[in-house]
Amino acid sequence: MRKAEVKRKTAETDIYVELNIDGKGSYDIKTGIGFFDHMLSLFAKHGLFDLKVIAKGDLEVDTHHTVEDVGIVLGTAFLKASGDKKSIKRFSTFYVPMDEALVRVSLDISGRPYLYYDLPLKAERVGNFETETVEEFFRAFAYNFGITLHVELLHGVNTHHIIEASFKALGKALDEALKLDERIDGIPSTKGIL
């Protein structure tokens, strides 16, 4: 099974992540940021990953460091757990609607980190969660996993719905791209490496 455990401690945050890519969607998320916990839970549930995230951060300052650093550690965990990437499907695009919102996530587990982000969010906060940190999370995740990630709003206005659809879509897209396909012999690249 493809699993990883990653710890990271800085002067701003202390984060622990356990990941099983081949899980059933169980989760235990505790970041101190209620809305972010909800998003990571949805990500795990819909991606069918078993995920544990325990994070302590300088929330008295703001949520930025915690959200970004969870992205760093989670991306690192996916990189470790995905191993040599032999026989993975590699690419995926997934659309997720939530009421009026429709979000598309496309990704390539390529070893080439990149983020294209186009989620215009009207509200500055959802609960104590600062919405500008959504982009920081996706960037940290993509760059530490080493994937090309596109996250786009096709339509929608409700900030909660847009963010929720994006986390669900990321989970679904990763589930598909990380699936093993017996027809793929070795690394899914003509270069021979990812």
Swiss-Prot record:
Recorded GO MF terms: imidazoleglycerol-phosphate dehydratase activity
Location of the protein in the cell: Cytoplasm
Catalytic activity, EC: 4.2.1.19
Keywords: Amino-acid biosynthesis, Cytoplasm, Histidine biosynthesis, Lyase
Catalytic activity line of the entry: D-erythro-1-(imidazol-4-yl)glycerol 3-phosphate = 3-(imidazol-4-yl)-2-oxopropyl phosphate + H2O
Record keyword Cytoplasm present: yes
Annotated PROSITE patterns: IGP_DEHYDRATASE_1 (PS00954), IGP_DEHYDRATASE_2 (PS00955)
NCBIfam families, sorted: PRK00951.1-2, PRK00951.2-1, PRK00951.2-2, PRK00951.2-4
Protein name, per record: Imidazoleglycerol-phosphate dehydratase
Species whose genome carries this gene: Caldanaerobacter subterraneus subsp. tengcongensis (strain DSM 15242 / JCM 11007 / NBRC 100824 / MB4)
